């Protein structure tokens, strides 16, 4: 029931399936591992939905004139995270089909709130209602299968998307960590 209510609210009758999206972001990004350390950023992102994928290019301002360029992507089943000071000095370079791919596919799946036709069962998402306001969505892309918990507001729209465990980079390694995205101010 909550997913049907969401789809009826978010989509129009006869709406075509979204195949691709371009998004510009600006805001602040928490760079802290143990304490909050919010830094301004701007980015451009391209998303494809026919086979889950995205390519996010960002600049995070660490200090005036000192930017970190971040490339975060999920392409053809591979996760990519590369960050470089001034775009020249590599700080992080992770790629592959294991936990990196899993984390990046989670990001794609959670952000599908912005292109909701990607959440239709016809697009490969399996849904299981948990209660009147939440459901578990499961997505498979190639060898990666994952599930996220979606909660919906009184208006029927997505409020949160959470994973019990998503890899987080700490000291050069990946640490499983609970992870949530929050959505509000739909326009």
What are these regions (language model features)?
Residues 136-186:
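Gly/Pro-enriched, hydrophobic low-complexity segments
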Residues 24-26, 32, 84, 128, ...:
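A structural detector for beta-sheet-dominated domains
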Residues 4-89:
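N-terminal mature ectodomain segment of secretory-pathway/periplasmic proteins
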Residues 82-141, 171:
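Flexible, processing/modification-adjacent segments and terminal tails
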